[in-house]
Amino acid sequence: MTENYKHTSVLLDEAVNGLNIRPDGIYIDGTFGRGGHSRLILSQLGAEGRLLAIDRDPQAIAVAKTIDDPRFSFVHGPFSALADYVSERDLTGKIDGILLDLGVSSPQLDDAERGFSFMRDGPLDMRMDPTRGQSAAEWLLTAEEADIAWVIKTFGEERFGKRIARGIVERNRIEPMTRTKELAEVVTAATPVKDKFKHPATRTFQAVRIWVNSELEEIELALKSSLGVLAPGGRLSIISFHSLEDRIVKRFMREQSRGPQVPAGLPMTEDQLRKLGGRYLRVLGKMMPGEEEVAENPRARSSVLRIAERTNA
């Protein structure tokens, strides 16, 4: 990282308020980033409170080291493994709240060397953790055209996915792409109809980033783990930034709040119904950023905060 980035967390107060912080509670900030949410949580905890922060971005490690607080601990890794981190600390079923701020952060987008943005030329990387897995350039060079098209259509909701995939494969045959600018140029050239409100490469960059980082799978794993990690009354406070993320969160909260779906007229005793499982979550609602926050931070426009509470089931 070549410079110090100031990062304003979207829906900062609302997301932390959604945790309903208890002074002696135990909380998880699953997406530490630059520490905005963690610092606010710590400010509301008493001497007996604890906060475990998680992030797979190596740049978050240096930021975490600046928080000299005995109540605070940090794990470098994916939030999908939160159940393991909690189990190692003998805290399973004792967590009072989990906060997740999904997707790519502004500092990651603004750092050209990370390769997340088509607005800044840099290495075609896009990995949240550059020490693990394939970079975007490596995947695009080795993947089949049909697979690239599927990823762009599925995770970018891009209607010209096949044309763009063909352009990527043809470009890589001539000379392998290594820069974000090169990918943006290929996508732009392969897009026959341009959206005047959106750069042609927006959806493709989103799709490749999601695929390279297994972002949606990470979310699903973390959500499933949360049920066993949270104490009764523990909160889930989750910020999504695009419809694919929000769809997963919304569906999970809805399904876990409905309880077992039994066909009408099926004769079952109360004991049999209990064995099927109960309503594990109570949905508390959703929030969107206000006009003032969007004006100050345009990237907040598409964000959605959803909050749910673990039941006694």
From Swiss-Prot:
In which residues is S-adenosyl-L-methionine bound?
A: G35, G36, H37, D55, F79, D101, Q108
- An example Gene Ontology biological process: rRNA base methylation
Pfam short name (any one): Methyltransf_5
Q: What is its main location?
A: cytoplasm
Q: Does the keyword rRNA processing apply?
A: yes
Kindly state which keywords UniProt assigns to this record, in alphabetical order: Cytoplasm, Methyltransferase, rRNA processing, S-adenosyl-L-methionine, Transferase
Instruction: Fetch the InterPro entries from UniProt.
Output: RsmH, SAM-dep_MeTrfase_MraW_recog, SAM-dependent_MTases_sf
Q: What cystine pairs are annotated?
A: none
UniProt GO cellular component terms: cytoplasm
Named from the GO MF annotations, one term is: rRNA (cytosine-N4-)-methyltransferase activity
EC no. given is 2.1.1.199
Q: Which domain of life is it from?
A: Bacteria
Q: Where in the cell is it found?
A: Cytoplasm
From the UniProt record, list the reaction(s) this protein catalyses.
cytidine(1402) in 16S rRNA + S-adenosyl-L-methionine = N(4)-methylcytidine(1402) in 16S rRNA + S-adenosyl-L-homocysteine + H(+)
Q: Which family does it belong to?
A: Belongs to the methyltransferase superfamily. RsmH family.
Q: What does this protein do?
A: Specifically methylates the N4 position of cytidine in position 1402 (C1402) of 16S rRNA.
This chain's protein is named Ribosomal RNA small subunit methyltransferase H
Q: Which organism is it from?
A: Enterobacter sp. (strain 638)
